[in-house]
A protein has these predicted regions:
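Glycine- and small/polar-enriched repetitive beta-structure motifs of secreted/surface proteins
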Residues: 3, 9-218
């Protein structure tokens, strides 16, 4: 079913619920509201939200152009302006915040909470909590990273299996793997692997413990 209405404050709004190819789905947009084809149990609210969805099921997108290019992914949640905008065929992702998980096209199992979190990474199994956490660079395949704190893991590109805890922790690491950075501090090397740093959580001026890839603690 489609309903259009106009008044002094609403120019043109399109509303679709149930009906052919809309089983269990609800789309509310502006001028158009998607073209579901054998897709079920989806909810899209906002201009162009879920606009390209064809066969994906159980997706929720709320916000201007949220998941606007998603075609066949399942079990995704995107909340915020352009959250998951470039996602096309990904599943089991959660992105909350404007531009979160923006460039992730086909990878799954990511969690991004905070504006610009996991903005550029296209990898899978990343978890980021905080403004610009794991923001990265557009179309870089970082995988299995965890970042907790505003700006943590900010510069990540192709690094994997890293853990960053604290505001701006490890925000210089780009391609390093298996690093653990706790506290507001940079890693010794942006490309190094298996670096361990435990620092104070204020400004990172004091590193209490450091370890290297050989298991040596400094």
């Amino acid at each position: 079913n489609t309903v259009d209405w106009s008044d002094s404050s609403i120019e043109t709004v399109t509303f679709k619920q149930e009906g052919t190819n809309f089983t269990g789905s609800l789309l509310v947009g502006h001028a158009t509201s998607g073209t579901l084809n054998a897709a079920e149990n989806n909810t899209g609210v906002g201009i162009d939200a879920l606009d390209a969805l064809t066969t994906g099921d159980s997706n929720t997108a709320v916000g201007f152009q949220a998941a606007s290019t998603l075609t066949s992914g399942t079990n995704n949640t995107f909340l915020g302006k352009e959250a998951g905008k470039i996602v096309s065929n990904s599943s089991n992702n959660t992105a909350i915040g404007g531009n979160s998980l923006f460039y992730n096209t086909t990878s799954s199992n990511n969690t991004a909470l905070g504006k610009n979190s996991v903005f550029g990474l296209t990898g899978a199994d990343n978890t980021a909590v905080g403004y610009q956490s794991l923001k990265g660079v557009a179309n870089q395949n970082g995988n299995s990273n965890t970042a907790l704190g505003s700006g943590s893991g900010l510069a990540m590109t192709t690094g994997a299996n890293n853990i960053f805890i604290g505001k701006s922790s490890g925000d210089n690491i780009t391609t390093g793997d298996g690093n653990v950075i706790i506290g507001s501090i940079n890693a010794d090397s942006a490309t190094g692997d298996k670096q361990l740093i435990l620092a104070d959580g204020v400004d990172g001026s004091v590193a209490w413990i450091k370890g290297d890839s050989n298991g040596q603690v400094k």
